[in-house]
Design a protein with these regions (language model features):
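Acidic, polar-rich low-complexity tracts and alpha-helical solenoid repeat scaffolds
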Residues: 22-256
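Sec-dependent bacterial lipoprotein signal peptides
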Residues: 1-23
Length: 256
C-alpha cells in the first residue's frame, strides 16, 4: 500500500510539473486578454534570451493585439522590431516598426526602431531577388534617419551603410555596361558608363568605368573620345592600375 501511495505521489507531482511547464511555455497563439501584458513581455524576453527571436517577436506583438496604446504596448512593439530583425524576418520587423512609428513617433525608442528598420533594408542587399531595390530602400531610409537624428550615436554606421549601398548600385550598373560590351553593343555600354559618371561623385568603381568607356570608344573607332578619357584618367586616377591599363589600351590601338 505504501508503495502504491508513493507511486501515486510521484505521478501527481509529475503531472503538476507538466502543468506548470505548459503554463510557462504557453505559445504566442495561446495568449489571450486574460494574460497580463507584463506576463506576455516576460515570455517574449525568455524566448529572446534563449535565441528564439522569431517566437519572441510573436509574443511581443500579442501585447499590441490585446493591450494597444498601453505602456507595455510601446515596449512590446519596440522589442518585436529588434527580435524579428535578429531572426532575419525583415518584413515582420519593418511591419512592427511602421506600427510603432505611427503610434509612438515621439517615443524615446523611435530612433532605435527607425535604425533597425533602415538596417533591415541594407541586410537584404545580399538577397538576389531584392538586391537593387533593397539598396535603394537602404539609402532612402537611412537618409531619413539622419535627417531626423543628425546627432545620433549611430550616425557613422548609417553613413557607412549608405555608402556601401551606393557602391553596390554603381557596381551593378557597371556590370550592366560590361554585359553590353560582351554582347558587342558598345553604344549601349557608353550610355550606361556615362550615366554612372554623371550620377556618381565618389566610388571605387569609377576608374574602371572610365577604362570601359575607352574600350567602348575604341570599338566604335572614336579615337578622340578615347584619348580624352585617357587624359581625364591620368589627372583623376593617376595611381590607379586601371589608368595604366587604359594607357596600354590606347598604345595598342595605335592612337597617338
Amino acid at each position: 500500500m505504501r508503495f502504491l501511495f508513493g507511486l501515486l505521489k510521484i505521478f501527481t507531482t509529475y503531472v503538476l510539473l507538466l502543468l506548470l511547464l505548459n503554463c510557462s511555455n504557453k505559445l504566442p497563439s495561446e495568449i489571450s486578454e486574460n494574460n497580463k501584458p507584463s506576463e506576455i513581455i516576460k515570455l517574449g524576453d525568455e524566448a529572446y534570451e534563449k535565441g528564439y527571436f522569431e517566437r519572441a517577436g510573436d509574443y511581443y506583438l500579442e501585447v499590441n493585439k490585446y493591450f494597444p496604446y498601453s505602456v507595455e504596448d510601446e515596449l512590446g512593439l519596440s522589442k518585436a522590431v529588434d527580435a524579428y530583425y535578429r531572426a532575419r524576418k525583415f518584413e515582420n520587423s519593418r511591419l512592427a516598426a511602421s506600427k510603432f512609428l505611427s503610434l509612438y513617433p515621439e517615443s524615446s525608442k523611435a530612433q532605435k526602431v527607425l535604425y533597425f528598420r533602415s538596417k533591415s533594408f541594407c541586410d537584404e542587399i545580399d538577397i538576389v531577388e531584392r538586391d537593387q531595390a533593397a539598396a535603394r530602400d537602404c539609402i532612402s531610409s537611412f537618409l531619413a534617419f539622419l535627417s531626423l537624428y543628425p546627432k545620433s550615436v549611430s550616425k557613422k554606421e548609417a553613413e557607412k551603410s549608405i555608402s556601401n549601398a551606393r557602391e553596390f548600385l554603381v557596381g551593378q550598373q557597371l556590370n550592366v555596361g560590361k554585359y553590353y560590351l560582351k554582347r558587342n553593343n558598345p553604344a549601349a555600354a557608353i550610355r550606361r558608363f556615362k550615366k554612372i559618371k554623371e550620377t556618381t561623385k565618389v566610388s571605387s568603381f569609377l576608374p574602371e568605368v572610365s577604362y570601359r568607356l575607352i574600350e567602348s570608344f575604341l570599338l566604335l573607332g572614336l579615337s578622340s573620345e578615347a584619348g580624352s578619357e585617357e587624359e581625364y584618367m591620368r589627372k583623376k586616377f593617376s595611381n590607379s592600375s586601371w589608368t595604366d591599363g587604359a594607357t596600354r589600351l590606347i598604345d595598342k590601338s595605335g592612337l597617338d
